[in-house]
Amino acid sequence: MTGARARSLDAKRARRQSILTTAEQILRSDGFDAFTMNSLATTTGLAKGTLYLYFSSREELVLALYIHLNDDWVDRFLLAEKANLPPDYAALCARFYQSFAADALLVDLAGRAASGLEPYVATGAKVTAKRAYARAARRISGLFYQNFDCDPAQAQRLAWAFLAALSGAQQRAIEMQDNSVLPEDLRKLGQIMSCKDVFLNMVLPLAPRHREDPFGDIKS
């Protein structure tokens, strides 16, 4: 990445995206705890002061990357679902979780966003994040509405429930990176209370109902 000053709006957008791309590479290779603005400056060849022109803190940068990864995941999931017809709710629930869990960095940042990133960024960055979550829910609700012919409000509630269930599963699952450190009773419980199990336990009972036909009771 060149250190020349980005002057035009397009150049600034390109530089911002380049910074995010490099940050993603570092996070995937070294992990969150090892990621610093110093390491990013070294890898990009930019001064730290330049990085702070685009992101006011490490947390703001990582939150922006999380939003980007989350948008990409929703894109992939919705595209893949076009081939999965006729719709099967239980199968969709499993595919939804699997598509999310396929990206380890997305999973890691999703677990950090609410308590480890958002509290440490300015209001503007928080607003951007909340709007991104709403955008994701709106797009997913469109899938539910189209595939299951449910009421729009129900489709929207279901989409939010799916996203909340992902967060809840990360917090409540009996699961660690190394389950061997768990006591025997928790290892046994973890066999039926993994993140995937907790997620499915929350969303499977929420199968959408078809919209009622307002003319269904009218006899010809």
Regions found by a protein language model. Give the residues of each.
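Amphipathic alpha-helical packing segments from all-alpha helical-bundle domains
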Residues: 119-149, 156, 160
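N-terminal, Lys/Arg-enriched amphipathic/low-complexity engagement segments
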Residues: 1-5, 18
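Generic hydrophobic, amphipathic alpha-helix propensity
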Residues: 12-23, 40, 65-69, 73, ...
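Amphipathic alpha-helical segments used for helix-helix packing
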Residues: 101-124, 174-180
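Hydrophobic alpha-helical connector segments
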Residues: 64, 78-106, 159-162
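Helix-turn-helix
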Residues: 18, 26, 30-60, 64
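C-terminal peripheral helix-coil segments that are non-catalytic and often amphipathic
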Residues: 2, 138-142, 146-149, 164, ...
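Alpha-helical DNA-contacting segments of helix-turn-helix folds
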Residues: 62-69, 132, 136
